[in-house]
Curated annotation (Swiss-Prot):
The gene is SFSWAP. Residues 1-28, 155-185, 272-298, 332-354, 404-439, 512-569, 592-927 are annotated as: Disordered. Residues 426-439, 615-633, 718-733, 865-900, 915-926 have a biased composition (Low complexity). It comes from Homo sapiens (Human). Residues 9-21, 169-178, 592-601, 646-682, 736-755, 814-824, 901-914 have a biased composition (Basic and acidic residues). The keyword Phosphoprotein applies. InterPro entries: Surp (IPR000061), SWAP (IPR040397), SWAP/Surp_sf (IPR035967), SWAP_N_domain (IPR019147). Its main location: nucleus. This is Splicing factor, suppressor of white-apricot homolog. It comes from the Eukaryota. The modification Phosphothreonine is found at T642. One of its GO terms (molecular function) is RNA binding. SURP motif repeats lie at residues 211-253, 459-499.
Length: 951
């Protein structure tokens, strides 16, 4: 691939060396011819670019300028200037010779064989065909099972003390050969129902017909590929010559195969051999009694006699133990039945099935699940082709009668010593309302069910159970695969009726088991269900809000069939379906469902329970807010579930699983996020402490004030700031003359005491935040502290700035730190110089900041001095005030203008100092402010959106 032209030239040298070495070796060896072979090493170099170019066809050139035909330089067409003579479109045999329909079919089969490996795993197919071939070999064997190995006495275990007896085995062998010869030579007579065309030759013997019949049956089930494999395997076996197209029995084989596919033919070859075996049972028993001398074999070691399973399963049920619980259940149901004589679907009266009692209860239990249908009828095999139905069923054993209805029922006389049960009488229901009468033959007219052979039956039973558990989508997906093993899913298949019967049986069993499991929690009063959605995870009631969502998604038909809701809120019990006669399922079959329920309901964590309850209630509110969780009263007897109910129940189960899984994932994610947030909060708190140690204690005092009112901080961070819109004016700041100086300017010792108290309070809050009890509160405090620090609107920030710049020497010392703190706030939240921006900032005012304003008011010398702002800063709120009807539009007194000019001259020197001191902490603060800026921006945007939507 990567060797390019150098790699191609080497093999040519090698082959040339072989040719040259041949004569040289012959000349030196005399009469003995020697061959000397030598070659050169060829190194391959990986060249990805050239390989890619080769892959994309960049080395190809157009032939004779025609870009439709691209060739490489080694192509022989490069020597030709005209290709029409050699074009396949005109000279191929398929153009000149049109295929007939049969030839086209054979050609299609050949094409399928040619390209089989493209879409089929040949190894798996070969293994499957080997298995089917073994099954066919066993089916073609005539004696009992264990035919693969011949069982002989005396050959391997020679005892010299015993005399050798050659006469008896030889006689027995001759007798068996004579019997086989008689059977093999028995001429074949076509049955009456099999209308063979006149031009089709019949097989000469019954044995040949049996081989053809069984081969056709296997090919119908396994597909044409099995026939090809069988033809290759049995190429030398003359008994399978009918598989060849030119054999005289091939048309008969094709006819039988077509009849089987269309359902017009059932296997009949086994009946005669079974009758012979039955007739020979007595003689076999006599022979066994005679052979009790030397070679005695215990009966338990005998190979089992090969019997017809179809006939065995079709025997009518005539035995039921009177002490069996099912018999008592039948009597009780007939006595308590409120329906008159049941009628079939077409109106013909059906006699209630009564059975003859004997002591063999195991046989009854074994056969119950096979052919006792839910409507009380037995499934009998269809009559052979060409035989009248009435004459066929009239030959059934005594005690089995056939009604005129399509569903075949059987009745037997009551057991001796017992009186027949009286006909059921009508009775009113306890609720007083007339319940809908459910007839025993509620199902559609049931077609006669053909039980499958023992190798197919477990597959059908398993698939029916899986479909009952997983829903009809599973059945459609299996049918879409077109697997030969699951061909019974097709409605035309002979075992489809048996599959449908088993599927309905498992559906009823699944429905009944789940309804029993649901019945206990559903008995809770309906009033408590809507009031306590969070308790659904504790008591494990499936009738919670999650189920409402599932029912709303699947059509909501389940409540209508299981219970009828009266407008006043009471539930009327619906009538239940007839009892299905079947063996009770083992406890192990129900374990997977129980395990799932335990996993869903067994949540010991309170947080998880509340979270699941909230999720289930929210999902119910999203899917169908008007529907309240219904409480369905379930009868003790199992109702017959419809397809919609089963799909709704399965959807509910899947939804519960998904909800539980989502809750667990969310809990794990929340715990992980909470740990990360704790780490982030701890880092931010340490960074804030580091910044506060670098600053003066005045910001610490303010931080203490912020922590004094954590609830107001949380209010400002969680609730939207009330924006004043429209014509609502901002609360005016009254400018009063400096008649009352503040207490802080008169007595500075009191101010120091206050600061000490605040420091103590801050230390106490720090120690409290380290304890696990106050972990979450400290987290919210630290977050709100940082938010409140940086999310002050511009109107309040100007007020705070003006108050901090008083003329006292104490205040003067703190002003650079204040200015540095303000500089660390993002520029988007400082006082803007544009009127539009200032108008936006001056509108939002939180209650927490109003408290701060009141506290800072008490600290200033006078309220008039606190209003003095430098002209550069005062210029922004002044034009914005008329638009917002703010009180900042009050005229500035000469005292204020004088103070502002003095502060401006001071501010130039103080800003230089602040630039030097802020360089130390600017790198740390920039990271924190970037994180907080996004949060504050989102909070302000959300508050504005909420306020505008409310207005």
């Amino acid at each position: 691939m990567y060797g390019a032209s150098g790699g191609r030239a080497k093999p040519e040298r090698k082959s040339g060396a072989k040719e040259e070495a041949g004569p040289g070796g012959a000349g030196g060896g005399g009469s003995r011819v020697e061959l000397l072979v030598f070659g050169y090493a060829c190194k391959l170099f990986r060249d990805d670019e050239r390989a890619l170019a080769q892959e994309q066809g960049q080395h190809l050139i157009p032939w004779m300028g025609d870009h439709k035909i691209l060739i490489d330089r080694y192509d022989g067409r490069g020597h030709l200037h005209d290709l029409s003579e050699y074009d396949a479109e005109y000279s191929t045999w398929n153009r000149d010779y049109q295929l007939s329909e049969e030839e086209a079919r054979i050609e299609a089969l050949c094409d399928e064989e040619r390209y089989l490996a493209l879409h089929t795993d040949l190894l798996e197919e070969e293994a499957r065909q080997e298995e089917e071939y073994k099954r066919l070999s066993e089916a073609l064997a005539e004696d009992g099972s264990y035919n693969a190995v011949g069982f002989t006495y005396g050959s391997d275990y020679y005892d010299p003390s015993e005399p050798t007896e050659e006469e008896e085995p030889s006689k027995q062998r001759e007798k068996n050969e004579a019997e086989n010869l008689e059977e093999n030579e028995e001429p074949f007579v076509a049955p009456l129902g099999l209308s063979v065309p006149s031009d089709v030759e019949l097989p000469p013997t019954a044995k040949m017909h049996a081989i053809i019949e069984r081969t056709a049956s296997f090919v119908c089930r396994q597909g044409a590929q099995f026939e090809i494999m069988l033809k290759a395997k049995q190429a030398r076996n003359s008994q399978f010559d009918f598989l060849r197209f030119d054999h005289y029995l091939n048309p008969y084989y094709k006819f039988i195969q077509k009849a089987m596919k269309e359902g017009r033919y059932t296997v009949l070859a086994e009946n005669k051999s079974d009758e012979k075996k039955k007739s020979g049972v007595s003689s076999d028993n006599e022979d066994d009694d005679d052979e009790e001398d030397g070679n005695y074999l215990h009966p338990s070691l005998f190979a089992s006699k090969k019997c017809n399973r179809l006939e065995e399963l079709m025997k009518p049920l005539k035995v039921v133990d009177p002490d069996h619980p099912l018999a008592a259940l039948v009597r009780k149901a007939q006595a308590d039945s409120s329906t008159p004589t049941p009628h079939n679907a077409d109106g013909a009266p059906v006699q209630p099935s009564q059975v003859e009692y004997t002591a063999d209860s195991t046989v009854a239990a074994m056969y119950y699940s096979y052919y006792m249908l839910p409507d009380g009828t037995y499934c009998l095999a269809p009559p052979p082709p060409g035989i009248d139905v009435t004459t066929y069923y009239s030959t059934l054993p005594a005690g089995v009668t056939v009604s005129n209805s399509p569903g075949v029922t059987t009745t037997a006389p009551p057991p001796p010593g017992t009186t027949p049960l009286p006909p059921p009488t009508t009775a009113e229901t306890s609720s007083g309302a007339t319940s809908t009468t459910t007839t025993t033959s509620a199902l559609a007219p049931v077609a006669a069910i053909i039980p499958p052979p023992p190798d197919v039956q477990p597959v059908i039973d398993k698939l029916a159970e899986y479909v009952a558990r997983n829903g009809l989508k599973f059945e459609t997906s299996v049918r879409a695969k077109n697997d030969q093993r699951f061909e019974f899913l097709q409605p035309w298949h002979q075992y489809n009726a048996y599959y449908e019967f088993k599927k309905q049986f498992f559906l009823q069993k699944e429905g009944g088991d789940s309804m029993q499991a649901v019945s206990a929690p559903e008995e809770a009063p309906t009033d408590s269900a809507p009031e306590k959605p969070s308790d659904a995870g504790e008591d494990g009631a499936p009738e919670d809000a999650a189920e409402v969502g599932a029912r709303a998604g699947s059509g909501g038909k389940k409540e209508a069939s299981s219970s009828k809701t009266v407008p006043d809120g009471k539930l009327v019990k619906a009538s239940f379906a007839p009892i299905s006669f079947a063996i009770k399922a083992k406890e192990n079959d129900l374990l997977p469902l129980e395990k799932n329920r335990v996993k869903l309901d067994d949540d010991s964590d309170d947080d998880e329970e509340s979270k699941e309850g909230q999720e289930s209630s929210s999902s119910a509110a999203n899917t169908n807010p008007a529907v309240a969780p219904p409480c369905v009263v379930v009868e003790e007897k199992k109702p017959q579930l419809t397809q919609e109910e089963l799909e709704a129940k399965q959807a509910k189960q899947k939804l519960e699983d998904r909800l539980a899984a989502a809750a667990r994932e969310k809990l794990a994610q929340a715990s992980k996020e909470s740990k990360e947030k704790q780490l982030q909060a701890e880092r931010k708190r340490k960074a804030a402490l580091f910044l506060q140690t670098l600053k003066n204690p005045l910001p610490e005092a303010e931080a203490g004030k912020i922590e004094e009112s954590p609830f107001s901080v949380e209010e400002s961070s969680t609730t939207p700031c009330p924006l004043l819109t429209g014509g609502r004016p901002l609360p005016t700041l009254e400018v009063k003359p400096p008649d009352r100086p503040s207490s802080k300017s008169k007595d500075p010792p009191r101010e120091e005491e206050k600061e000490k108290k605040k420091k103590k309070h801050k230390k106490r809050s720090r120690t409290r935040s380290r304890s696990p009890k106050y972990h979450s509160s400290s987290k919210s405090r630290s977050r709100s502290h940082s938010k409140a620090k940086h999310s002050l609107p511009s109107a309040y920030r100007t007020v705070r700035r003006s108050r901090s710049r008083s003329r006292s020497p104490r205040r003067r010392a703190h002003s650079p730190e204040r200015r540095r703190e303000e500089r660390s706030v993002p520029t988007a939240y400082r006082v803007s110089r544009s009127p539009g921006a200032s108008r936006k900032r001056t509108r939002s005012r939180s209650p927490h900041e109003k408290k701060k304003k009141r506290r800072s008011r008490s600290r200033t010398k006078s309220k008039a001095r606190s209003q003095s702002v430098s002209p550069s800063k005062q210029a922004a709120p002044r034009p914005a005030a008329p638009a917002a009807h703010s009180a900042h539009s009050a005229s500035v007194s000469p005292v204020e203008s004088r103070g502002s000019s003095q502060e401006r001259s001071r501010g130039v020197s103080q800003e230089k100092e602040a630039q030097i001191s802020s360089a130390i902490v600017s790198s740390v603060q920039s990271k924190i402010t970037q994180d907080l800026m996004a949060k504050v921006r989102a909070m302000l945007a959300a508050s504005k959106n909420l306020q505008t939507s409310a207005s």
